[in-house]
């Protein structure tokens, strides 16, 4: 099976991965088309996807789970138009029934779904694929689009509000305080915004997207460039976290919510799958303790499902892992004690 119409195929002539921009970029505002209301919005997520898990983190940190409903896809991609031999796209599907299972997009393996495995149906429309939601929002003209999660869906207007995670988390942080369980938590405080913005920039290019530049590269030169920059940025994180508790200062911020999902996947997936094996995160003393610290922050662990994470990556891309074999380890313990309290004031 070829990469088809998926992100794996988004490479330049020199073999470098080039991520496409999100296409839905509406914002939640008090006086705009999309206002902050309880029960109006629905999130489509994957526990495997680091971008979607940013949004899940905010949902739990801000105490918005009673106000925004959620559907979670199965981790293993499927052919989204299985009866069309000319359409090779593989992507997210829903498998909400316990006892049901699916194979990978090339027909290999058997991977269970249902609530026992944190997989839900599409509670709004009964969609089979996330692609169906894009078709619904784009009047059937979605072919060629990257059918990504997270999706913030508006039940009133029956369309996608946003599929850009960085903007969704900003809005969840600031626009729903009237109904949020934690109204005082501000992950983008004014005094730290310059530091947060600076960190977000190099973390995104070097680490968040950097691991994909390594894993999806199709030339040695593109891989070498990406992996060198990735570890330069990880070394920078290690140095920074030797001086302060969090990546942008002394308190948990949006920058941590954006960095953490990549780090928590690194040793379990990226070291093998994306060839980022120069060094493990658990070999960085400050970074490893930081990962445990953030994970143990109330609300954050709800965004981590390692079965989803490993199952997705190792079973969804036949061009990278033809037999869909999922490695058994290393199964690191994120609940181990950490030493980050040494920075507490």
Feature names for model-found ranges:
Residues 1-345:
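C-terminal alpha-helical interaction module
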């Amino acid at each position: 099976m070829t990469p088809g119409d998926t992100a794996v195929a988004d490479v330049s002539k020199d073999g470098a991965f080039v991520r496409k921009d999100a296409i839905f970029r509406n914002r939640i505002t008090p006086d705009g088309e999309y206002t902050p209301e309880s029960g109006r919005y629905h999130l489509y997520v994957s526990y495997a996807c680091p971008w979607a898990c940013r949004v899940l983190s905010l949902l739990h940190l801000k105490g918005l789970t009673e106000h925004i409903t959620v559907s979670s896809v199965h981790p293993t991609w499927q052919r989204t138009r299985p009866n069309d031999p000319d359409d090779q796209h593989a992507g997210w599907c829903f498998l909400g029934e316990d006892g049901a299972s699916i194979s990978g997009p090339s027909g290999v393996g058997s991977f269970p779904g249902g609530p026992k495995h944190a997989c839900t149906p599409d509670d709004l429309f009964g969609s089979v694929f996330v692609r169906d939601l894009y078709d619904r929002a784009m009047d059937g003209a979605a072919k060629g689009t990257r059918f990504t999660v997270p999706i913030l869906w508006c039940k009133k207007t029956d369309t996608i509000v946003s599929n850009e995670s960085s903007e969704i988390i900003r809005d969840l942080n600031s626009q729903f305080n009237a109904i949020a369980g934690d109204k005082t938590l501000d992950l983008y405080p004014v005094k730290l915004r310059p530091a947060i913005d600076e960190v977000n920039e190099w973390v995104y290019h070097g680490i968040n997207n950097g691991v994909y530049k390594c894993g999806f590269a199709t030339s040695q030169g593109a891989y070498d460039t990406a992996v060198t920059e990735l570890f330069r940025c990880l070394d920078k994180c290690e140095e920074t976290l030797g001086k302060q508790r969090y990546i942008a200062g002394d308190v948990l911020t949006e920058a941590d919510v954006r960095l953490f999902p990549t780090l928590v996947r690194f040793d379990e997936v990226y070291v093998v799958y994306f060839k980022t094996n120069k060094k493990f995160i658990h070999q960085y003393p400050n970074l490893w303790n930081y990962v445990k610290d953030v994970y143990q922050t109330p609300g954050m662990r709800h965004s981590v499902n390692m079965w989803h994470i490993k199952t997705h990556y190792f079973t969804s891309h036949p061009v990278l892992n033809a037999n869909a074999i999922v490695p058994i380890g290393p199964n690191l313990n994120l609940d181990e004690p950490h030493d980050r309290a040494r920075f507490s004031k």
